[in-house]
Amino acid sequence: MSDSNHSLDLHSYTQLEVERFRESLIQFYDKTKRILPWRKKECIPPSEDSPLEDWEQPVQRLYEVLVSEIMLQQTRVETVKRYYTKWMETLPTLKSCAEAEYNTQVMPLWSGMGFYTRCKRLHQACQHLAKLHPSEIPRTGDEWAKGIPGVGPYTAGAVLSIAWKQPTGIVDGNVIRVLSRALAIHSDCSKGKANALIWKLANELVDPVRPGDFNQALMELGAITCTPQSPRCSVCPISEICKAYQEQNVIRDGNTIKYDIEDVPCNICITDIPSKEDLQNWVVARYPVHPAKTKQREERALVVIFQKTDPSTKEKFFLIRKRPSAGLLAGLWDFPTIEFGQESWPKDMDAEFQKSIAQWISNDSRSLIKKYQSRGRYLHIFSHIRKTSHVFYAIASPDIVTNEDFFWISQSDLEHVGMCELGLKNYRAALEIKKRKVTSLSNFKEPKLTSARRIVTKAEC
């Protein structure tokens, strides 16, 4: 149902307000923008019949923004800064990325950042763009979203506006929050009519002179000022034309919010109107409406970190295997794992460990596992799954023989192979490595195992 106590006109600005919105946001950005490695001046593309050398800088700028924008989706800025710098040092151009082998040259650069389908989409987009003559690269968001694999409307708008100064709007979580509050859209703005309205507003509001700076300012405002739970309205550059803020002031003055219904009544806002007490304490943060969260499912697994040491060089090696090509962490490297799914833990994890060895170690080599120890259970949280791993650490003889599809990799190469963060977390747990206190996975002292056989931790999570 919709809340029809106001018209659709509530969710729009006059031309004067639009200009004020743009000016205030650009001024805010000029004063507060963060210095980031991917923030450079836009590079307007030349005419279609220009020689190739005139396209070099525009294409390079487009590539830099494409990499940064895909990395920034669902990853903190401080984390992206490290990954972006390493990526650009290794794959500095669109051509170098397109020609790089995905599993050995591209994926390892992403390892540890999570949401690995983003990496695949970025590589696919670069491969597609590299095949085009620069003049054939689309210049509108719709053409990008339809024609460039792995790129959606948000990424298209961000790349075109920031890199090529195209007046294209963008919509992400930060933008939804800012615009739903600025124009008092009380709905779930991530889908349906409300999302379409947000996109319409984003395209209408974008500054035609500085579209890239405007879009970055809009995202910056949502990230540091118009935050989800405690918006800093007193320092917000658009508070004077923010309708949620105006509502808050009316309520706090002891008055009632009333809108004149003119023309078409609103069919977007929902009827979930909070009590007066709630409004007094939470009026701005009530926008946008958040859908009910889907409960994360619980999954369990047994993971074994097998280690062997070269007797001559003393170099340590670890047993890994590639995860299936579909499903969670598809195609990434991980340690030997037995998935229990949502089933309860087996009563005897030591017995499970010994039973699982048959899947990984050849029959003649099982006696060559010299020591093993349970290291306990460790939780890793994905967006939709709470994954608990019961980790074992096993020391094997150098002569051990594994079954097919398993590989021994040196400790130094673990950092570069494209290991999933879940695997690295279990590895650190097994070897008692404190993530924040080491600069390399090889920087640790090997822990001592206290027994040659049965040591089982009865830890519950």
UniProtKB/Swiss-Prot annotation:
Residues 296-437 form the Nudix hydrolase domain. Disulfide bonds: none annotated. Its EC number is 3.2.2.31. Keywords: 4Fe-4S, DNA damage, DNA repair, Glycosidase, Hydrolase, Iron, Iron-sulfur, Metal-binding. One of its GO terms (cellular component) is nucleus. A motif (Nudix box) lies at residues 340-366. The active site is at residue 69. Pfam families: EndIII_4Fe-2S (PF10576), HHH (PF00633), HhH-GPD (PF00730), NUDIX_4 (PF14815). SUPFAM superfamilies: DNA-glycosylase (SSF48150), Nudix (SSF55811). It comes from the Eukaryota. Monomer. This is Adenine DNA glycosylase. The gene is myh1.
